[in-house]
Each structure stands twice: as structure tokens, then as C-alpha cells.
Amino acid sequence: MKRRTGQDQSITRQWRPATQAVRGGTARSEFGETSEAIFLTSGYSYDCAGDAAARFAGEQVGMTYSRLQNPTVEMLESRIALLEGAEACRTMTTGMAAMTAVLLCQLQQGDHLVGGRAAFGSCRWLTDTLLPKFGIETTVVDARDPQQWIDAARPNTKVFFFETPANPTMDVVDLKAVCAIARERGITTVVDNAFATPALQRPMEWGADVTAYSATKMMDGQGRVLAGAVCGTSQFINDVLLPFTRNTGPTLSAFNAWVVLKGLETLDLRIRRQSENSLKVGAFLETRVPRILHPGLASHPQHNLAMAQMDACGPIFAFEVDGGRQQAHGLLDALTLVDISNNIGDSRSLMTHPASTTHYGVAEDKRIEMGVTENLLRLNVGLEDPQDVIEDLDQALSKVGL
């Protein structure tokens, strides 16, 4: 039936990614709507008590409660899994809900996790503060160095967890090498792929077991809603992750799922155009600031690795001034086009000072260890004409003496 073509994986897995992003997962109702329907309902009715009992027993196909299943949410999950090349996906309320769930569902007291040093501030809180409360130990390594992963692994190590590119320092992790180290030891690799999205990087193709996302970022792409996602094998999603999420309740709403579905339709176009814009803006800044951390530029120490793993550089990068927080804040305050915002992945250009925003809650010694100094600024380049962004940065840099 054509109205369910988007659910037929024998068809959809033959499509190219740009087509999958528009049509993957779509299941039209009897009305034949061209845009996915929003099923704003908390529950579902049954024709008889026996049907209700059969559904809860898993003997009858159908919905029971929107904390567990929702047609709009399931369309989004099918589409993300398709783009990722994964067997299954589970969405959640936020990216951090996804990161928390993907770790807690598979770790218990006495287990050990190895995590990448460069990470989003809340992810470092999760591994450094929350997990130890449950008797789970974490070792932090420079994720760029495969030998450090080897040295940190123990008999009780259950998970390798890292971002690539990392937020906000743009560290790039050798996916093939680190995933191979984990697989040889029976360790599950969880990759936060939010900066790249499956449009630019598919970690599972390099050996990752699980990928996790803040779908708030590039997947939505317009700064509208919060959402998170985890992709993996059907066994992992249904047997390991789902029991945790269905009983703890980080359920994505149907409306937010629909918004992300709409965002995915333009993901391929947006992220490639923003990558092009980012390169142009980065090339300009490279001539004006003391240091730039942009994986798309040859000056990045891991440029070759980044370009081998990614289809394009992405819209986000970091750079440094030389006058500390005062100069960094002065630069932000002098901007007239670029917004001061701690979000990323938006169609608008956004800039933030991570040490005083996204990583404010990280202890100073850990921030410095991560490379999040008072000089560091993070820039998300949007869909504006890059020359307008460059001119705004030019005048702001001049005002702070750069």
C-alpha cells in the first residue's frame, strides 16, 4: 500500500539519504495526508476488554499509551534509524535525556565507563557526578589518543562514551580505531553524533554500537523544540533501552516529534550549505584571531581524519581571542547580526562563551583540562549570506582590538 511506503524498509533502504530524510518512516492515515499527521493523544481506546489485555500482553499489534507508543513519534524514530543505518531508534524529550538513558540502561554498580575528556558540560556532569552516585566509576581520557583508551580499559569496563567532533573544542576521535579497541574487549561504544548528524557522519559504519543525539540541534535546525534520540540494534533498543525509558518516562511529545520530522526534510540541504558557509567564515577568522579550531580547515591538527570520517565539516567551530573573558564578552556584545546564544545547529548564526555558559557548571580545573578556556568562543554559522556574517565579525573584532 503506497500510503505506508515510508515504512517498508525493503524500499526505503534503497533510497539515497536525501530521499530518506524527506520520506522515510512516513505512514499516511486513511485520509492520505501528504504531511505526517500529529497524533496528539495520551491514550488509545479498545474495542473490547480482551483487546486491551492482548495488547498489554504483546499478543496484539496496536498502541496502548503514548508514553510507550505514538504514531507520530514512531514515524520520527523510523526516519532517524533509516538515516543512521541502524536497526532501531528510540526518541526522548531532550538530548540529555537520551545521554542519561543510554548510559543508565546498561550500567550498574561495580561497572566502569571510559569517557572522552572533551564533552558538553552536562555530559561531563553525568559521567563525573551522577554515575559515581550509583557506584559506577568513570575514567576520563584524551579521546584523540587510541592508546589512552587501551590503557584505561579494565575487565569491568562496559562502555566507551565520547563525542566527535567534541563540544566545544572540536576534538575529532578516530572512530575506526576506538571502536575496534572496544569491540576486541566486548565493550559497547556509544557515540554522541549531534554535531555531525547522520547526514555528515555515520559512526556505525566505523564500528560504533550505539549513537546518541540531541535532535534539538541540526535535526530540528530552526531552534524550535527539544528532542533526543538513541540508535542501535533492535536487541539493544528493545531489550536494553526500552525497559528503562518506558518505566522512567522521558517520552517525546507527538508535536515535538512532528517538528523534528519537518526539520529532517531539509537537513541535507541545510547542513551542507551551513558547512560551506562555515568554511568561508572560518577562513576569514583564521586571519584575525590567535587560534581557530575548525576541522574543515587544514590548520586543524585532525583535519585529514575529520574529512575521512565526515562528508563535510559541519556548521560549528571554535576560536580563541587573547584577552580572556573580558575580551570574549566584549566581542559578543559588539555583534549586531550574530546572536548570543548557547544553542547550536540553528539556521541562524549563534555564538557563545562556553566557560561562562555551557560549561559554567564544570569545575575550573576540569574546564582547563578540556580546553575550555576563558579565551574560547564557539560559533554556529547559519544560513545567512556568509559575507554578512563575516562583516559582522569583522566590525566586532575591530572593536575589541583584534
Language-model segments: residues:
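Conserved N-terminal alpha-helix of the aminotransferase class I/II PLP-enzyme fold
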Residues: 48-97, 122-129
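Conserved PLP-enzyme active-site core in the AAT-like
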Residues: 6-12, 18-30, 88-293
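Glycine-rich beta-alpha junction loops
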Residues: 26, 40-46, 195, 217, ...
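PLP-dependent enzyme catalytic core of the Aspartate aminotransferase-like
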Residues: 1-5, 128-129, 137, 349-402
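A common structural junction motif
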Residues: 248-249, 334-345, 396-402
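Conserved C-terminal alpha-helix-loop-beta "cap" of PLP-dependent enzymes
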Residues: 293-377, 381
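N-terminal "arm"/small-domain region of PLP-dependent enzymes with the aminotransferase-like
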Residues: 2-70, 78
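Short amphipathic alpha-helical segments
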Residues: 61, 87, 226, 256, ...
